[in-house]
C-alpha cells in the first residue's frame, strides 16, 4: 500500500463505507449473540454507531495506514500486515465501542463483555476488516492505492 497523499474524497468515502458496513454487521452479531443485549439495545447501539463511524472512519484509515507503515519497518511479510491490522483495529475501536455501549444504556457487565469479546474476536476481525477496507478502497478506485504483496 502506498503512503497517502493529500486528502482524497474517494479515500474518505471508501473508508467510511467500509467502517459503517463492517461495524454494523459485526457489532450486532456480538451484541446479541455474545453479550446478551436485546435486539432493541443492539439496534440502538448500531444506529448510534453509524454517525460515530462516519466521524471516525477516515481518521481510523489514517491511523491504520500509519500502523501498517510501522509494521512494514519491522517486517514486510503478510503476517506483519495482519498483526498491524489487528493492533490498529483494537487500539482504535475499543474505546469508541465502549462509549457507544455506555451511551445506549448497556450495563457495565455488558460493556465489559462486549468490548472484551470484540477485542478477542478482533484477532480475526481486525484482519478481516483490513482486507474488507483494502477491497473497498479498490472498489472506490482510490487514487494511488495499491496493495503490497506479501
UniProtKB/Swiss-Prot annotation:
Q: Does the keyword Transmembrane helix apply?
A: yes
Q: Which domain of life is it from?
A: Bacteria
Q: Where in the cell is it found?
A: Cell inner membrane
Query: Is Transmembrane one of the keywords?
Result: yes
Topology relative to the membrane: Multi-pass membrane protein
What parts of the sequence cross the membrane?
Answer: 17-37, 48-68, 86-106, 111-131
- What is the predominant subcellular site recorded for this chain? membrane
> Which family is annotated?
Belongs to the AlaE exporter family.
Q: What does this protein do?
A: Exports L-alanine.
Q: Specify the protein name.
A: L-alanine exporter AlaE
| Upper lineage | Bacteria, Pseudomonadati, Pseudomonadota, Gammaproteobacteria, Vibrionales
The encoding gene is alaE
